[in-house]
């Protein structure tokens, strides 16, 4: 089954559950108190931290038993960096939380609301005026990319960059890729 945002999706039976990057989440918990959020936004940010803690496939594995008794395992890998495009501070922070919990570095443009907090997020957040040149493989588009920007991404040399529509929030499971080992 595909890992997408659908109400019917059921998590696979895991022999080893996903493990969030707790160090990154602790740093983000500290940052929540510095961000200019009102009480309702702080509650939403805290909920995003809790959600990221349990909804990750980082270091998760499931065992698939073959018909002749062989042991096959299925695990997932994530990219090193994902570009978060657009959104307000709360939306961008929620996407950062999902990515950081999965051990993924977030790349933003200098005009992103998160960019001014890059000193507090060293190693978790990278600011780059040309994110497509920062070794990204995915774009979490909180706001739709302009057609010019899409043309620019399509016309560049190298691997394709996958655009993840994230207007309703980033679904971290879309970022992971299956790896099967026998």
Show where each model-derived region lies.
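C-terminal segments
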Residues: 1-85, 89-91, 98-182
């Amino acid at each position: 089954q595909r890992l997408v945002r659908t109400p019917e999706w059921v998590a696979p039976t895991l022999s080893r559950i996903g493990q969030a990057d707790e160090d990154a989440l602790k740093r983000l918990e500290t940052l929540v108190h510095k961000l200019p959020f009102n009480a309702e936004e702080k509650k939403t940010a805290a909920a995003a931290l809790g959600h990221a803690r349990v909804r990750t496939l980082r270091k998760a594995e499931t065992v698939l038993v073959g018909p002749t008794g062989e042991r096959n395992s299925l695990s997932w890998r994530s990219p090193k960096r994902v570009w978060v495009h657009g959104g307000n501070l709360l939306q961008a922070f929620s996407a950062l939380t999902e990515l950081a919990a999965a051990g993924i570095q977030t790349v933003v443009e200098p005009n992103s609301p998160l960019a001014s907090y890059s000193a507090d997020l060293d190693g978790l957040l990278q600011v780059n005026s040309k994110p497509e040149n920062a070794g990204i493989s995915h774009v979490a588009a909180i706001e739709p990319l302009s057609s010019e920007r899409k043309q620019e991404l399509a016309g560049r040399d190298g691997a394709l960059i996958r655009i993840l529509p994230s207007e309703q929030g980033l679904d971290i499971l879309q970022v992971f890729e299956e790896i099967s080992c026998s």
